[in-house]
Amino acid sequence: MKLSNKEFDKIVQRAIRRIPDEIRQHLDNILITVQQWPDPDLLEEMGYPPDEPLLGVYWGVPLNERSATEPPLYPDTIYIFKGPLEEMCASLAELEEEIEITVVHEIAHFIGISEERLVELGYE
């Protein structure tokens, strides 16, 4: 599936609106940006397997690791990777659901929720 950037951005916005308020409220201070593909250097730095698609990543300092005296140097950002999501999804509904799951996972990294807890909440 290939979408224009404008169409993809609309689906990202719809997916974000589907996220429960208690999780979505944490987006107030997080920038969300869409990139076509993850940078290969980023994948290598993360130790991410090259044969697994990376759908999104949180870049910043998680709340539970912040210092009261030293604020983060850069804004917290969630990157959504359009190319891998388009390749993975067969329908617009599936794409919207995967974007929602991806954004929730990245918010979880920001607020310190573990992968195990996300599974318990239904976000696998």
Q: Across the structure, where does each feature detected by a protein language model lie?
A:
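Short hydrophobic/aromatic patches at helix-to-coil boundaries
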Residues: 120-124
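Short alpha-helical catalytic segment bearing the HExxH-like zincin motif
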Residues: 98-106
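Active-site rim/adjacent substrate-binding subdomains
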Residues: 1-98, 110, 116-119
